[in-house]
Amino acid sequence: IVFRAAQERSDIEIVAINDLLDAEYMAYMLKYDSTHGRFNGSVEVKDGHLVVNGQTIRVTAEKDPANLKWNEVGVDVVAEATGIFLTDETARKHIAAGAKKVVLTGPSKDDTPMFVMGVNLKSYAGQEIVSNASCTTNCLAPLAKVINDKFGIVEALMTTVHATTATQKTVDGPFHKDWRGGRGASQNIIPSSTGAAKAVGKVIPELNGKLTGMAFRVPTPNVSVVDLTARLEKPASYKEVCAAIKEAAEGELKGVLGYTEDDVVSTDFNGEKLTSVFDAKAGIALNDNFVKLV
């Protein structure tokens, strides 16, 4: 997904990929995607490297990032997407190998700074290694920021109805850390934990301790939903809340937060470029201090 997104931007050039897959299989997985469809471009393998739209991309299969010699191909930024090197200490091996910056594509397992577009990016101070948080945090944080800035959040609960992920089982199997997580993904709605709400407290410090949440894993291949149920400090009608979100989506958070009043469903957002889209018709309010936002 990172590669496909980069191909749509003229200011990003992919120069190298490190993966334990061989280049032929990598090319196959790039060409064909069951969720996002066929790749719009030419893909071939030459001398063990990928050639995409005529550009050669170095392919390596190193288990230790320290051996990657990023300096040989002029790497500026590494997207660390293995899910393994999620601490400053381990991700710093990329820096030792010649990269200038590292972006972790998931939440860090230590105190590595976490940034969410549209929320706390202005506080970035040139750190070499940062986390881009999780998909759920990127969905939740912009919405929570708007509500907290405009009305104040006293306390809130978040539920994400989350699409199936690669760690789940196709049929029941052992999963010692999470027994329910070991049940068949296509057969069940599976309650699960999520660190997304806690992560929001890191990118919006005012909400630290005011927000927690859980997840339901559901049998869909892509697109997830976040349900934010919040008690507001300043009373506001649901219409006023929607108006504030729409204003932010068309203003300071344009390109990050979206707003829709259409009768949409999850598949309508397959390939969505915005990190969060507020569904005005899906939410409800109990009163002027208690709202559910989707």
UniProtKB/Swiss-Prot annotation:
Residues the record marks as active site: 135 (nucleophile)
GO biological process: glucose metabolic process; glycolytic process
Localisation per UniProt entry: Cytoplasm
First-listed, main subcellular location of the protein, grouped into a coarse class: cytoplasm
An example Gene Ontology molecular-function term: NADP binding
Residue sites binding D-glyceraldehyde 3-phosphate per the record: 134-136, 165, 194-195, 217
Swiss-Prot/TrEMBL catalytic activity: D-glyceraldehyde 3-phosphate + phosphate + NAD(+) = (2R)-3-phospho-glyceroyl phosphate + NADH + H(+)
Quaternary structure note: Homotetramer.
Full protein name: Glyceraldehyde-3-phosphate dehydrogenase
Organism of derivation: Serratia odorifera
